[in-house]
């Protein structure tokens, strides 16, 4: 039995919210992938709580997209079971998002500590492993930084001359530009702080997006419950 009257308006608004859920899901996946790429470059393959956060963000985004699809099918067919499933899953997603937000706040300092520890370890292998050298050079080029804390970290690397830094530290990169360098010709800020700043900006972005998504999800739960009640009333009449 088709819904009537005010429920048609609720059903239409639910469709709009479902489209918003899809957009939010894509946004979460994109942010999670971006953070994961940075972590992959700067942190070793050791699994830690901090390094798992972007994976959880991606998983929540993918699950939200799936739930939005279930809700769309339920609203379109006015299926009682699908709408109940949609409301329950949407509530679970909200709980996970709260948990992720809390974990992100709790482990914010641990992520930076992991950066520093991993970067220092990889710097020790810069002259021994070409793959490591390529990763660090790319990281320094893309983030306009040099070393872990600052450019002087390279002085403690075995085999590295005291007056030399990798060419990737140079502002204008040319072959051999890191030899006999001047502070004015290289990036002096360390990569750990540079990347930490990038992560803080994006974590704030995620937090702001999460608040917006949570508000939309609450509306989604309310509208879906209204639609479920209307569908159930229709069945009872039949």
Swiss-Prot record:
Spell out the subunit comment. Answer: Interacts with TIMP1 and ITGB1 and recruits TIMP1 to ITGB1. Interacts with CD9. Identified in a complex with CD9 and ITGB3. Interacts with PMEL. Interacts with KDR/VEGFR2; identified in a complex with ITGB1 and KDR/VEGFR2 and is required to recruit KDR to ITGB1 complexes. Interacts with SYT7.
Membrane topology qualifier: Multi-pass membrane protein
What Gene Ontology biological process does one annotation of this record name?
A: regulation of potassium ion transmembrane transport
Modifications made to the protein after synthesis: Palmitoylated at a low, basal level in unstimulated platelets. The level of palmitoylation increases when platelets are activated by thrombin (in vitro).
Segments spanning the bilayer are: 12-32, 52-72, 82-102, 204-224
Which Gene3D superfamilies does the record match to this protein? Tetraspanin
Q: Does the keyword Transcription apply?
A: no
The residues exposed to the Extracellular compartment are 33-51, 103-203
From the Swiss-Prot or TrEMBL record, what is one GO molecular function term? Answer: protein-containing complex binding
- Extract the Pfam families matched here: Tetraspanin
- Tell me the residue ranges located in the Cytoplasmic compartment per UniProt: 1-11, 73-81, 225-238
**Superkingdom of this entry's organism?**
Eukaryota
Into which family does the record put it? Belongs to the tetraspanin (TM4SF) family.
Q: Which GO terms describe its cellular component?
A: cell surface; endosome lumen; endosome membrane; extracellular exosome; late endosome; late endosome membrane; lysosomal membrane; lysosome
- The name this protein carries in UniProt is CD63 antigen
- Glycosylation site list: 116, 130, 150, 172
Q: Where is this motif: Lysosomal targeting motif?
A: 234-238
Q: Which UniProt keywords apply?
A: Cell membrane, Endosome, Glycoprotein, Lipoprotein, Lysosome, Membrane, Palmitate, Protein transport, Secreted, Transmembrane, Transmembrane helix, Transport
Function statement: Functions as a cell surface receptor for TIMP1 and plays a role in the activation of cellular signaling cascades. Plays a role in the activation of ITGB1 and integrin signaling, leading to the activation of AKT, FAK/PTK2 and MAP kinases. Promotes cell survival, reorganization of the actin cytoskeleton, cell adhesion, spreading and migration, via its role in the activation of AKT and FAK/PTK2. Plays a role in VEGFA signaling via its role in regulating the internalization of KDR/VEGFR2.
Q: What happens when the gene is disrupted?
A: No visible phenotype. Mutant mice are viable and fertile, but display impaired water homeostasis, with increased urinary flow, increased water intake, reduced urine osmolality and increased fecal water content. Mice display inclusions in the principal cells in the renal collecting duct. Mutant mice display variable graying of their coat color and a dramatic reduction in the number of melanosomes in the retinal pigment epithelium. According to PubMed:21803846, mutant mice display a defect in the Selp-dependent attachment of leukocytes to endothelial cells.
Found, by tissue, as follows: Ubiquitous. Strongly expressed in kidney. Detected in spleen, bone marrow, peripheral blood mononuclear cells and macrophages.
* Cellular localization per UniProt: Cell membrane; Lysosome membrane; Late endosome membrane; Endosome, Multivesicular body
What the entry lists under InterPro entries is as follows: CD63_LEL, Tetraspanin/Peripherin, Tetraspanin_animals, Tetraspanin_CS, Tetraspanin_EC2_sf
